[in-house]
């Protein structure tokens, strides 16, 4: 590690898949709670900008931090990738604090589309932030348009809070030119922020929360010490369902359970709690996990590998200390219990966006009962499973990967998906067969619409036939379908579903994946969507496209008028309580020969 004079920490990471990775501690959306929810996420969207023909980049905003990364598509553009990332924060050698010329309205519309996308496909439920005084979703909504002047002022104030000790930078190759670039940019930040916000996060004590969730969970507050953090790192290498969360200066250890009785058993037997360490701690963590450690715990001033000896030599004492801390916290009711619930009518609380949930006080006296050893899911050697697109279980595997992204890595291939994981076969089967997980994976059916209409355009089945089997993912491979698409004079079909989206088939002699990528970024800049998915069809220069959007009419008009599209057949879905597919007529759209 190289420590710049102002406290910025720079780590060379030769094996990293990114060229540069920047983490900003104490810069997440929990800072919005006393001010205006959504400012942090809006700032992230405004800052990141890049040439997608030369680079791949992304950014994220979490509760306590922000992170940004960039990677060049060609090796000769490595230094340019670093310069691009630096330009997000510095312009002409000075920190960016003036946002008077930024078209904030379009960015806010993009945030609303992202909320809609995440709410349709996932359940956006940030329980700790809600209990601390925020909302269940804190990424920004259209209501920010009502306070544009205040938003611009807050964006500048937020940037002026950047300070050297809160910045962590990973670089794949730390050349003299790269180091000089970082020194004359991030190295010029002050050691202390110009303003220190009065973050007002309420205390959380003895709560049970019922929300849509794939697992039962316990969030137990422990002392935020280096010993407890190292103990959690030890546990994470042994157990799948152990992790941590931070809220301000507080540290929570999280435990997830497949079955309710295992969650109850953990609380009943916490006095006899004994964790089993891994034979050897290897620190085989992703770049994202390591970055999250540094930005969540700014007092980590050494390379993580420097703690490797301590993690192995003192793992057992570290775990014993954490166990005692957990017992004390349970006795003092410093915990949150999460129970999965999928009933929209069962609630007694709501946030400012009208998200509803049930919040109760925990009554541990009711937990008295016979001892039971909680079911543990220990990590196994890395394994892979391949699931074809026609397999009815595909949706379950996808839902599993989305629910546990750190434990399972999903990769889309031409004929199916490959899931890399560290579970035993019995453990994975038990999780996917559990009643709670099944309810969770079926509770957000909007993700299926992409495949429902892909099947409609690429197979011989009618919409009625496809809808009868919507719970089983489409059993076909679009690349193998040789049906000839015949575009009718009527190029648009209006339907009513539970979601708002645009999808269909586009054809044009110059249409390509690169062109669709350019279209996605143009639509994002206009604030019309968050993401555009596309699938190459069998016919030449023909693509199936799909996009969730709260502005489906504008997205459709863009594709209908796009010069690269010579023919199109689109479905525009408006949101409604009763689904109506009556406008779709297979024989009009597709002729199978």
Swiss-Prot record:
It comes from Molluscum contagiosum virus subtype 1 (MOCV). This is Probable metalloendopeptidase G1-type. Its EC number is 3.4.24.-. Coiled coil: none annotated. Its cofactor is Zn(2+). The active site is at residue 44. SUPFAM superfamilies: LuxS/MPP-like metallohydrolase (SSF63411). The lineage of its organism: Viruses, Varidnaviria, Bamfordvirae, Nucleocytoviricota, Pokkesviricetes. Seems to be involved in viral proteins maturation by cleavage at Ala-Gly-|-Xaa motifs. Keywords: Hydrolase, Metal-binding, Metalloprotease, Protease, Zinc. One of its GO terms (biological process) is proteolysis. Zn(2+) binds at residues 41, 45. InterPro entries: Metalloenz_LuxS/M16, Peptidase_M44. Pfam families: Peptidase_M44. Binds 1 zinc ion.
């Amino acid at each position: 590690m190289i420590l710049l004079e102002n406290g910025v920490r720079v780590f060379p990471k030769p094996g990293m898949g990114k060229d540069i990775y920047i983490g900003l501690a104490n810069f997440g959306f929990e800072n919005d709670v006393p001010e205006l929810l959504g400012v942090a996420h809006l700032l992230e969207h405004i800052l990141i900008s890049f040439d997608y023909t030369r680079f791949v980049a992304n950014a994220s905003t979490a509760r306590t931090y922000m992170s940004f990364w960039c990677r060049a598509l060609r090796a000769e553009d490595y230094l340019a990738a670093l310069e691009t990332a630096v330009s997000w924060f510095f312009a002409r050698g000075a920190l960016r604090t003036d946002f008077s010329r930024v078209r904030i309205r379009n960015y806010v519309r993009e945030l609303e589309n992202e909320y809609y996308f995440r709410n349709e496909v996932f359940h956006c439920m940030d329980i700790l932030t809600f209990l601390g005084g925020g909302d269940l979703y804190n990424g920004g909504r259209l209501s920010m348009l009502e306070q544009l002047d205040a938003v611009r002022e807050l964006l500048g104030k937020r940037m002026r809070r950047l300070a050297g000790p809160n910045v962590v930078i990973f670089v794949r190759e730390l050349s003299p030119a790269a180091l000089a670039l970082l020194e004359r940019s991030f190295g010029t930040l002050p050691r202390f922020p110009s303003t220190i916000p009065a973050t007002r996060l309420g205390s959380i004590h003895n709560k049970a929360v019922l929300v849509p969730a794939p697992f039962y969970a316990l969030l137990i507050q422990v002392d935020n010490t280096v010993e407890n953090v190292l103990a959690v790192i030890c546990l994470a290498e042994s157990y799948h369902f152990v992790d941590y969360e931070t809220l301000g200066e507080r540290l929570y250890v999280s435990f997830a359970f497949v079955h309710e009785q295992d969650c109850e058993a953990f609380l009943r037997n916490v006095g006899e709690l004994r964790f089993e360490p891994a034979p050897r701690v290897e620190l085989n963590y992703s770049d994202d996990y390591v970055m999250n450690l540094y930005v969540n715990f700014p007092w980590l001033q050494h390379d993580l590998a420097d703690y490797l000896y301590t993690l192995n030599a003192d793992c057992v004492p570290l775990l014993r200390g954490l166990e005692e801390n957990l017992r004390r916290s349970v006795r003092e009711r410093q915990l949150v219990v999460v129970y999965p619930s999928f009933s929209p009518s069962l609630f007694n609380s709501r946030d400012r966006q009208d998200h509803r949930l049930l919040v109760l006080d925990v009554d541990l006296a009711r937990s008295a009962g016979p001892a039971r050893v909680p079911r543990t899911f220990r990590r196994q050697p890395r394994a892979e499973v391949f699931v074809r697109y026609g397999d009815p279980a595909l949706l379950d595997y996808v839902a599993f990967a989305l629910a546990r992204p750190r434990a399972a890595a999903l990769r889309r291939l031409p004929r199916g998906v490959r899931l890399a994981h560290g579970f035993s076969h019995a453990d994975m089967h038990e999780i996917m067969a559990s009643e709670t997980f099944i309810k969770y994976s079926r509770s957000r059916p909007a993700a299926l619409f992409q495949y429902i209409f892909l099947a409609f355009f690429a197979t011989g089945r009618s919409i009625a036939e496809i809808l009868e089997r919507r719970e089983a993912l489409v059993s076909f491979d679009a690349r193998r379908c040789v049906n000839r698409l015949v575009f009718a004079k009527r190029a648009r079909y209006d339907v009513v579903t539970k979601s708002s989206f645009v999808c269909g088939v586009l054809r044009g002699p110059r249409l390509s994946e690169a062109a669709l990528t350019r279209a996605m970024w143009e639509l994002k800049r206009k604030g019309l969507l968050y993401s555009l998915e596309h699938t190459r069809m069998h016919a030449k220069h023909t693509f199936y496209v799909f996009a969730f959007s709260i502005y489906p009419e504008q997205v459709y008009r863009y594709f209908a008028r796009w010069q690269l599209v010579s023919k199109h057949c689109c479905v525009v879905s408006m949101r409604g309580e009763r689904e109506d597919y009556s406008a779709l007529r297979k024989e009009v759209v597709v002729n199978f020969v």
